[in-house]
């Protein structure tokens, strides 16, 4: 636990005011992922030692801009190993997160992490985003899952219209990297965009972006 707590410094450098429970959850997160990644590879072997920077802190870039409020419902589509959903669920304990993925073995790891961290605000579902029916959420979050055009097509039916944040309408929030010029052009959308490197001063976040499309 002491080693994991030391690695948390890359998070606490940018985010403060965590409760003891949140600190313990973030620390335990590293231990559980490392153990399960030996059995089911949900995180690149070369990235597991950089888990807190490349996966946890990257996920929390969303929290640097969007201050979700208590009672909101967020869906993480194509959650993979649980990112960005699990770090955000720790960060926002009074917000409900629904994590979905089409690959069952990845959700097995997600469920083990959720149980180990005792995250009461997380549910999971083995399903493709486009197959979800009769459920709506305040925001959709996603990380490196699909082209923006597809993400938006999947997200639109999942977004309710009742606005719960003053600063932002309900919408899609996604983490992307690289040159997005062609992808954005092909989507015919005009997303709001933030350079993550302007928010988090770590070299890993060069050419990493946070995109937002309001419903």
Tell me what each language-model feature is.
Residues 1-70, 75, 105-108, 112-122:
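Class I SAM-dependent transferase core
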Residues 60-142, 152:
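Conserved SAM/SAH cofactor-binding pocket of Class I
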Residues 66, 159, 163-166:
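A generic alpha-to-beta junction signature in SAM-dependent methyltransferases
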Residues 96, 121-123, 171, 192-195:
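Conserved beta-strand segments of alpha/beta enzyme cores
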Residues 163-179:
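Conserved beta-strand signature within the Rossmann-like core of class I S-adenosyl-L-methionine
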